[in-house]
Amino acid sequence: MWGARRRSSGGSVYTNEYMSISPGKLKHLKALSNAKGIISAAAMDQRGSLQKSIATAKGVDVKAVTPEMMSEFKTAVTRVLTPHASAILLDPEFGLDAAKARSSNAGLLLAYEETGYDNTQPGRLPDLLPHVSAKRIKDWGADAVKILIYYTPFDTADINDVKHAFIERVGAECEFNEIPFFLEFVGYDPKGGDEKGLEFAKIKPQVVIGSMEEFTKPQYRVDVLKVEVPVNAEFVEGSAVYKGQKAYTRAEALGHYRRAAEVATKPFIYLSAGVSNAQFVESLHMATEAGTDYSGVLCGRATWKDGMGIYGKQGVKALEDWLSDQGVKNIEAVNAALGGATPWAKKLGIGAAA
């Protein structure tokens, strides 16, 4: 086992924060990283939202978007963008053929959760794909299991306890199969407010920090936290994408980045959460300015979302042409912003990942 013991200020060694990782998990984490030990991964596991966007572009009912169309879109994104990424996140429902099209340099993560959430009851409760397991994900050649849950510390204790138990089960399953567990949590307003608006932006730091503080705990056995940036850059006064309404000054925003990083005892990477490429790049610049020890990104729609309309209206060849031009420019802009990222091995205290 690889591990690290943290020293107290007095110099004595204590083990209550002992972190370890199996050789099997370590091998897979290396496969997901670039030469510097940074995770610069692309995300293409969208399902429900992708179907809706393609349907809108085609002017058809969502049921007219076939599994073949979904696979075709995912395969094009994978083939064109993975030469510029350390890994790709796909889903077992429509993405297994796409996984075969990835560049030889790129590792593979597979989603384990059902798309969306249970909307028949409060709390945005998650569920697993019924024909998938951590073992099957590993057998399909993946280097990591990814789970997305919707989470906020401000929901009821009962709802959050269901989610805690859910993640404990997945963590144990991944641990047994020696495959890394990437946990993505996306915040929401239990009262139904607009998560892209000013009022949610004001509480977003507490949502992100509280979520990171919870799921960094050892009982969840998460290896990498896939997190939202703790602020909405459109409401950061003076940011490159500032829209005029202030939720925080730049100094306050940088403080939120630092506090979020401080609570994480596990490596964490940022997700793009559907924002524009410019907004995500600005968010990464703020992370670097704040001095946070994030270990990379898993970037999806900020790279390829404009391609959905092109595919829907003009087909796969037009999509591939767009990806080869603007899509590559988008992913390279993200890669260029990763200069301040910290290798995950350093966060784990195990030295170089090589």
What is the role of each PLM region?
Residues A261, K266-P267, A273:
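Long, repeat-rich segments with strong aromatic
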Residues R6-Y18:
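Short, Lys/Arg-enriched N-terminal segments with co-localized hydrophobic residues
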Residues V229, S272-A273, R301:
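Short secondary-structure boundary segments
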Residues F73-R79, D127-A144, T152, I159-N160, ...:
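Alpha/beta enzyme core
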Residues E17-A157, R221, Q245-T249, K266-P267, ...:
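Alpha/beta catalytic barrel-like cores
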Residues K163, I167-Y188, D293-M308, G312:
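Amphipathic alpha-helical packing elements
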